Curated annotation (Swiss-Prot):
Lineage: Viruses, Varidnaviria, Bamfordvirae, Nucleocytoviricota, Pokkesviricetes
Broad class of where this protein is predominantly found: host cell
Swiss-Prot/TrEMBL induction comment: Expressed in the early phase of the viral replicative cycle.
Full protein name: Ubiquitin-conjugating enzyme E2
Entry GO CC: host cell cytoplasm; host cell nucleus; virion component
Subcellular locations according to the entry: Host cytoplasm; Host nucleus; Virion
Organism: African swine fever virus (isolate Tick/Malawi/Lil 20-1/1983) (ASFV)
Gene that this polypeptide is encoded by: UBC
A GO BP annotation: protein ubiquitination
PROSITE patterns, per database record: UBC_1, UBC_2
Pfam families named among the record's database cross-references: UQ_con
Protein family: Belongs to the ubiquitin-conjugating enzyme family.
Catalytic activity, reaction form: S-ubiquitinyl-[E1 ubiquitin-activating enzyme]-L-cysteine + [E2 ubiquitin-conjugating enzyme]-L-cysteine = [E1 ubiquitin-activating enzyme]-L-cysteine + S-ubiquitinyl-[E2 ubiquitin-conjugating enzyme]-L-cysteine
Cofactor entry: Mg(2+)
């Protein structure tokens, strides 16, 4: 059963698309989202479009979702299998200076935090030891070539794996393409699993009559 919290978040992201990430969902399973994260500008990851999968547990939002990169990544806090090491996705038993998952978190803020992490690694909590070592050398200007070179490889590969449609999306992200839903709007599920909001014509006619008065 899909929680009302998750459904509400999904609808909100469809109504208010982000320039920083793109989501797509299989209509048969709303608990698994495919995500493309845009590499932050003015960073080594700029230009990359990195694919990831989010899996929501049955008790969401009281338990954190799991995010796994499916694109190849070179980052101190991303394991070789794509799993992510970030404090806000840790459960109650995590000991990350109190920065653990909270039911008040929204998935859009989580995704923005993940994007921010790309440019601000935590080498003291490495998931990829080799990447962490390389990043430290880059950070302390002992080796300014190796880390950027590996990151740029992943940027290029991510673009090679993206469709032309995905690349075009980030060039022309629609902003506020639909009005904020109100009682006058109804949900209509599309074949691809997304939702659109349709306006009740009868309500529109009533509004026009009131205006005429």
């Amino acid at each position: 059963m899909v929680s009302s919290f998750l459904l509400a978040e999904y609808k909100n992201l469809i109504v208010n698309p982000s320039e920083h990430f793109k989501i797509s969902v299989n209509e048969d399973n709303l608990t698994e989202w495919d995500v493309i994260l845009k590499g932050p500008p003015d960073t080594l990851y700029e230009g990359g479009l990195f694919k990831a999968k989010i899996v929501f547990p049955p008790k969401y939002p009281y338990e954190p979702p799991r995010l796994t990169f499916t694109s190849e990544m070179w980052h101190p806090n991303i394991y070789s299998d794509g799993k992510l090491c970030i404090s806000i996705l840790h459960g109650d038993n995590a000991e990350e200076q109190g920065m653990t998952w909270s039911p008040a978190q929204k998935i859009d803020t989580v995704l923005l935090s993940v994007i921010s992490l790309l440019n601000e690694p935590n080498p003291d909590s490495p998931a990829n030891v080799d990447a962490a070592k390389s990043y430290r050398k880059y950070l302390y200007k002992e080796d300014l070539e190796s880390y950027p070179m590996e990151v740029k490889k992943t940027v290029k590969k991510s673009l090679d794996e993206c469709s032309a449609e995905d690349i075009e999306y980030f060039k022309n992200v629609p902003v506020n393409v639909l009005p904020v839903p109100s009682d006058d709007y109804e949900d209509e599920e599309m074949e691809d699993g997304t939702y659109i909001l349709t306006y009740d014509d009868e309500d529109e006619e009533e509004d026009e009559e009131m205006d005429d008065e």
